[in-house]
């Protein structure tokens, strides 16, 4: 009589395993596309988005960095003193009575936060001072705005939510500075997209915390020249990625190296 229960246990275990395996394969993260929130959106940068290059996140040429025209400047309420640089958002236009400038079907766009939209206290928040606190506002690259609304609208109500960033390749570390000052620009971050903590390790040092200088530029005042460098970064979803020996011992200032990215 004993073999029968063993067979039953095996069958049940197999069914349970099949049921949980898809969930087990998912990658944890805080931004799976949550509830929509309300904001407004305008545009800047010209039809080719060339005016969006540079910016308060430090990314420089958004084309070469892989961000392209899918970018936006965030108001104070969203920018979070630069900590939101690299975060990804899904945005869609919302028609309101007497204000119907959205494209049919209300298509959504995916953008990365790459710049800061400063407040203009000389103008009221509802008439020109669009980025004044506490307004959540997106100043979109012009091509992205035109994807969701008509040009003549100028400004439109939108719904937005945080979503995971999907990037090609690994996290990129661009090392600038000089012997006693290392300024590392962190770009192309998948997952949460925004980095809240960063550390560096040389071949002859332990892990050393880096401090945010501005945007996604992180600094260390240690002498690291001549050492292979490893980097450890943590996103706002509390996941951490370690890139061992991302930069070889012979690295030079101005070079960019690719490390391990977050899974999405």
Curated annotation (Swiss-Prot):
Expressed in panicles. One of its GO terms (biological process) is plant-type cell wall loosening. Residues 180-259 form the Expansin-like CBD domain. Belongs to the expansin family. Expansin A subfamily. Disulfide bonds join 57-85, 88-165, 93-102. Residues 1-25 form the signal peptide. It is a peripheral membrane protein. It comes from Oryza sativa subsp. japonica (Rice). It holds the Pfam family Expansin_C. The gene is EXPA7. Residues 54-170 form the Expansin-like EG45 domain. Keywords: Cell wall, Cell wall biogenesis/degradation, Disulfide bond, Membrane, Secreted, Signal. One of its GO terms (cellular component) is membrane. InterPro entries: Expan_Lol_pI, Expansin, Expansin/allergen_DPBB_dom, Expansin_CBD, Expansin_CBD_sf, RlpA-like_DPBB, RlpA-like_sf. This is Expansin-A7. It is found in: Secreted, Cell wall; Membrane. Induction: By gibberellin (GA3) and wounding. May cause loosening and extension of plant cell walls by disrupting non-covalent bonding between cellulose microfibrils and matrix glucans. No enzymatic activity has been found. May be required for rapid internodal elongation in deepwater rice during submergence.
